Amino acid sequence: MAVIAKFSIALLNKAIPLRRFFSAAALGLIVLVSSSLVFADGESGAEQLRQFVRNSKTAEGEFVQQQLRAPRANESQEKGLKVVRETRGHFVFQRPGRFVWDTQKPYEQKLITDGKQLILWDKDLNQATFRSAGQALATTPAAILFGETSLDQHFDLVDGEDRLGMKWVALVPKKIPNTKNGNDLPYTKISVGMANGLPKALELIDGLGSVVLVTLDKIQLNVNLPANRFTFVPPAGAEVL
């Protein structure tokens, strides 16, 4: 769980095993699509992202999350970044602040929030961790998808290059008054890849150069969701932290 390994760490607690966080994305990072959204040709990636955030009330789809690294000195440099870890699964969200990030392969793990608390369920460990959501969603990449529609309140959106068939938008966290570093995010760069008005990828880079890439597919927008979709009750005998 890498791209979101650190993403989840920001949401929950650094004391929780790293493996459990590979299912977050950025929070970050997780974005959805809809054929009902119409965007003008040539519209900037930043404006496409703003419109997507404004128009998406609920959504669900599939994700692939990869942790990448540069090749070492004794490895071939020809193939570029190497995949260190990869997870796959399903995600659901409902604004404001509700989501399920359901990792299904290579292990089963869920990150759930109803807007009030965050729950991390690890099936292999038979363990559920509960944390207060608080301002976490507003100050992390999760705000891109799961928060309210005020994306510009927390980030400056800067149009970047066209790459891999997408228009990339850099999200620069706005400085938070009375904090030493201006923000608590563990990333030096947060980018969203837009294509035809739809967010297709989320890329997170930390100070050590580690890259987490989340790609999204089979997205359905503004779907009807049952009220209990964002609740979770640990099974009998599970450890609760």
Segments predicted by a language model, with ranges:
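Bacterial N-terminal signal peptides that target proteins for export
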Residues: 3-26
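Bacterial N-terminal signal peptides
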Residues: 24-34
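Sec/Tat signal peptide C-region and signal peptidase I cleavage site
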Residues: 36-40
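Gly/Pro-enriched, hydrophobic low-complexity segments
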Residues: 42-43, 129-131, 153-156, 160-241
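Short N-terminal segments immediately surrounding and downstream of signal-peptide cleavage
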Residues: 42-58
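N-terminal mature ectodomain segment of secretory-pathway/periplasmic proteins
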Residues: 54-115
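A mature extracytoplasmic/lumenal domain signature
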Residues: 65-67, 95-97, 103-107, 115-117, ...
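Acidic/charged, solvent-exposed loop-and-adjacent secondary-structure segments enriched in E/D, K/R, S/T
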Residues: 120-146
